Structures are given as structure tokens and as C-alpha cells.
Amino acid sequence: DGAMDDHIQIKVSNMNIKDEQIQTLHPQPGKTNKKISLKKYAKIKKQLLAILSKKELTHTELMEALYEKVKDSFEGGVQWYGETVKLDLEARDIIERTNSKPEKYRLKKANP
């Protein structure tokens, strides 16, 4: 019965997706960032970029906005993952800090 084999196949591939990790980057040279679930990384990254596409926010505002968006659907510490992914996005030149006081975060203009 081939149906049983298909079921097992699907289960295994789902597991692999879930367990895939990404080594996040750190904006300061010589510092290493965390290795986290790729699925969680993708979810947090998408939300951070969506939030910052609307306006510049301070660190606190950004983390609060992120928490509001994912608190009902995210497993794990939202602030911890938010911070990890935010640093990674800075290291990849996708977001940047402003020179204003208080310091804010924004999307880098070069990105399409």
C-alpha cells in the first residue's frame, strides 16, 4: 500500500524543514550571533521588515510592534528572536540605525 509510504515521506520532510537552522550574523566584526530555526528567522524577519517599511522606530517601539504582531502565533521568546534577527538584518545591510536621538531603526534605502 503506497499511501503509507507517502505519509512517512511527508512527515520526514516536514521534520527537516522545521529543524533547519540558520547561522545569523552580527553587525560588529568579530562577534558571532546565534544559530536559530530558519522557520522562526523567516517569520521574524518578515515582520520586522513589514513594520519598518511603514516608519522608523526606536528599539523599544520596534520590539513592542513585533510582539503585538506575533505574540499569538510564535513559540519562543519574541524579544530574544527579535533581537537576534534585528542584528542579523543590520549585519546584512538590510536595516540600519539612524543618527538621531533617540536612535531609530529603518530600512536601508538601497534595497528595492
Model-identified regions with their sequence ranges:
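Long, low-complexity, charged/polar intrinsically disordered regions in eukaryotic proteins
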Residues: D5-K43
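Positively charged, polyanion-binding regions of nucleic-acid-associated proteins
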Residues: L38-E56, L87
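Short amphipathic alpha-helical interaction patches enriched in hydrophobic/aromatic residues
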Residues: L52, V70-F74, D93
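Short acidic, hydrophobic short linear motifs in intrinsically disordered regions
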Residues: L57-E68
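Short, positively charged loop/turn segments that connect secondary-structure elements
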Residues: Y67-E83
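A short, conserved structural fragment
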Residues: E90-T98
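Short, cationic-aromatic polyanion-contact patches
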Residues: S100-P112
